[in-house]
């Protein structure tokens, strides 16, 4: 559960309504793979990840980034039940994919950076603070099934 004030919730949903999920998702996942290259090991089937340009232009990275942001969008609609919303994804990433849950925090922080880049002055410190709460809540929910 994420505790947002009504103002924070409005800020999050208002900005999210302007997000191009295809573009932002691919950029966020791509930046994660470039900035934290050890995360690439989970994406062996994605082909060429040999350089920042290859990662950022990789269609599989873009497609998976869109999928990730689709799940994030779903979470925004269920802020009162993030653990339930992300239960299956948590189990998948824990039991089958063996993803270090710290990576969820990294991706959340990268997403905040990408949003700041895309929205500039509209991404005020108050909006950032609200999004930091949301990405922390999502990361916590995704780590929930870990032992």
From Swiss-Prot:
<dbReference type="GO" id="GO:0031721">
    <property type="term" value="F:hemoglobin alpha binding"/>
</dbReference>
<dbReference type="GO" id="GO:0031720">
    <property type="term" value="F:haptoglobin binding"/>
</dbReference>
<keyword id="KW-0702">S-nitrosylation</keyword>
<keyword id="KW-0349">Heme</keyword>
<feature type="binding site" description="distal binding residue">
    <location>
        <position position="64"/>
    </location>
    <ligand>
        <name>heme b</name>
    </ligand>
</feature>
<feature type="modified residue" description="N6-acetyllysine">
    <location>
        <position position="83"/>
    </location>
</feature>
<dbReference type="GO" id="GO:0072562">
    <property type="term" value="C:blood microparticle"/>
</dbReference>
<dbReference type="InterPro" id="IPR002337">
    <property type="entry name" value="Hemoglobin_b"/>
</dbReference>
<dbReference type="InterPro" id="IPR000971">
    <property type="entry name" value="Globin"/>
</dbReference>
<dbReference type="GO" id="GO:0005344">
    <property type="term" value="F:oxygen carrier activity"/>
</dbReference>
<dbReference type="GO" id="GO:0042744">
    <property type="term" value="P:hydrogen peroxide catabolic process"/>
</dbReference>
<dbReference type="GO" id="GO:0020037">
    <property type="term" value="F:heme binding"/>
</dbReference>
<feature type="modified residue" description="Phosphoserine">
    <location>
        <position position="45"/>
    </location>
</feature>
<feature type="domain" description="Globin">
    <location>
        <begin position="3"/>
        <end position="147"/>
    </location>
</feature>
<dbReference type="GO" id="GO:0004601">
    <property type="term" value="F:peroxidase activity"/>
</dbReference>
<feature type="binding site" description="proximal binding residue">
    <location>
        <position position="93"/>
    </location>
    <ligand>
        <name>heme b</name>
    </ligand>
</feature>
<comment type="function">
    <text>Involved in oxygen transport from the lung to the various peripheral tissues.</text>
</comment>
<keyword id="KW-0561">Oxygen transport</keyword>
<dbReference type="GO" id="GO:0019825">
    <property type="term" value="F:oxygen binding"/>
</dbReference>
<comment type="subunit">
    <text>Heterotetramer of two alpha chains and two beta chains.</text>
</comment>
<feature type="modified residue" description="N6-acetyllysine">
    <location>
        <position position="145"/>
    </location>
</feature>
<dbReference type="InterPro" id="IPR009050">
    <property type="entry name" value="Globin-like_sf"/>
</dbReference>
<feature type="modified residue" description="S-nitrosocysteine">
    <location>
        <position position="94"/>
    </location>
</feature>
<comment type="similarity">
    <text>Belongs to the globin family.</text>
</comment>
<keyword id="KW-0007">Acetylation</keyword>
<dbReference type="GO" id="GO:0043177">
    <property type="term" value="F:organic acid binding"/>
</dbReference>
<keyword id="KW-0597">Phosphoprotein</keyword>
<protein>
    <recommendedName>
        <fullName>Hemoglobin subunit beta</fullName>
    </recommendedName>
</protein>
<keyword id="KW-0813">Transport</keyword>
<dbReference type="Pfam" id="PF00042">
    <property type="entry name" value="Globin"/>
</dbReference>
<keyword id="KW-0479">Metal-binding</keyword>
<feature type="modified residue" description="N6-acetyllysine">
    <location>
        <position position="60"/>
    </location>
</feature>
<dbReference type="GO" id="GO:0031838">
    <property type="term" value="C:haptoglobin-hemoglobin complex"/>
</dbReference>
<dbReference type="InterPro" id="IPR012292">
    <property type="entry name" value="Globin/Proto"/>
</dbReference>
<feature type="modified residue" description="N-acetylvaline">
    <location>
        <position position="2"/>
    </location>
</feature>
<dbReference type="GO" id="GO:0046872">
    <property type="term" value="F:metal ion binding"/>
</dbReference>
<keyword id="KW-0408">Iron</keyword>
<feature type="modified residue" description="Phosphothreonine">
    <location>
        <position position="13"/>
    </location>
</feature>
<dbReference type="GO" id="GO:0005833">
    <property type="term" value="C:hemoglobin complex"/>
</dbReference>
<dbReference type="InterPro" id="IPR050056">
    <property type="entry name" value="Hemoglobin_oxygen_transport"/>
</dbReference>
């Amino acid at each position: 559960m994420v505790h947002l004030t009504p103002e924070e919730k409005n800020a999050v949903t208002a900005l999210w309504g302007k997000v191009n999920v295809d573009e932002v998702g691919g950029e966020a996942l791509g930046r994660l793979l470039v900035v934290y290259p050890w995360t690439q090991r989970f994406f062996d089937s994605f082909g060429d990840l040999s350089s920042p340009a290859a990662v950022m232009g990789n269609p599989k990275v873009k497609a998976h980034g869109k999928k990730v942001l689709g799940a994030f969008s779903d979470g925004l609609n269920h802020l009162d039940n993030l653990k339930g919303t992300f239960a299956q994804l948590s189990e998948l990433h824990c039991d089958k994919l063996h993803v270090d849950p710290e990576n969820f925090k990294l991706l959340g922080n990268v997403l905040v950076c990408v949003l700041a880049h895309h929205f500039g002055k509209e991404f005020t410190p108050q909006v950032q603070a609200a999004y930091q709460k949301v990405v922390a809540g999502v990361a916590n929910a995704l780590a929930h099934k870990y032992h």
